[in-house]
Amino acid sequence: MDIKIYTQDGCFYCDQMKELCKRAEVEYETIQVTTQEMNALYPKATSYPYVIIDGEEIGGLIESAKFFLKEGLVSANKG
């Protein structure tokens, strides 16, 4: 699985996305971008992090968490 996380400095939700990947025990690549770079790469991206998995635009943290749940990479159990 090829996971790219587009981030900005000081982004709390970006850190949460990285934690989700660690919890799921999947490798990921972080790519720091400016807003201008992000707009040029992925015009429909509206927030950070912006996650691409196997070339598919997944979206932000919530969409990525739903994807991980659907794929069985993490469970909804809290403990």
What are these regions (language model features)?
Residues 1-26:
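Local sequence-structure signature of Cys/Sec-based thiol-disulfide redox active-site neighborhoods
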Residues 42-52, 61-62:
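Structural micro-motif
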Residues 53-79:
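Non-catalytic, surface beta->alpha helical segment in thiol-disulfide oxidoreductase systems
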Residues 13, 24, 33, 57-62:
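A generic structural signal for ordered secondary structure
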Residues 18, 28-30, 51:
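Charged, surface-exposed interaction regions in soluble eukaryotic proteins
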